[in-house]
Amino acid sequence: FPMLLVDKIIEIGDDYVVGLKNVTGNEDFFNGHFPEEPVMPGVLVVEALGQTGGMLALKDVEDPEEYSTYFMKFEEVKFRDKVVPGDTLLLKLQLVEPIRRGIVKMRGTAYVGSKVVVEAVMMAMITKTKK
């Protein structure tokens, strides 16, 4: 099964995207992180931002199913609060600069309600998928 950490894209514009992830107690990562107090690993919240940003990166690409985004760099990553079962993650990404030569730079913010839980600036490259 693919590791999908976005349930739905709820809005997409020229330079931004908004996604949603309903965090349930059935997520595999909760088994060991932590059994007594389940917390979604922060790196998986960053991954959810990345997956949402991938939709923005590929939205204007012809035949997007033939391409992937691979992350090159993360900067200014801040973990502000924990994410627990029952939370709904709102994932917002905004282009920092126009996409050039397949390089995408975005600022992402993950929210639970109105509270910021993770922030990051990320850079990715768009590459043709090898078949």
PLM features per residue range, with description:
Residues 3-5, 89, 104:
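Hydrophobic core residues within well-ordered beta-strands of beta-rich domains
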Residues 28, 34-35, 39, 44, ...:
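Short capping/connector residues at structural and topological boundaries
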Residues 53-92, 117, 124:
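Hydrophobic beta-strand-centered segment that forms part of the acyl-chain substrate-binding groove
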Residues 84-87, 94-131:
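HotDog/MaoC-like acyl-thioester-processing domains
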Residues 1-40:
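Catalytic strand-loop segment that frames the active site of acyl-thioester-processing enzymes
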Residues 9, 19-21, 74-75, 93, ...:
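A structural signal for short, well-ordered beta-strand segments
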Residues 9, 40-64:
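Active-site helix/loop of acyl-thioester processing domains in fatty-acid/polyketide metabolism
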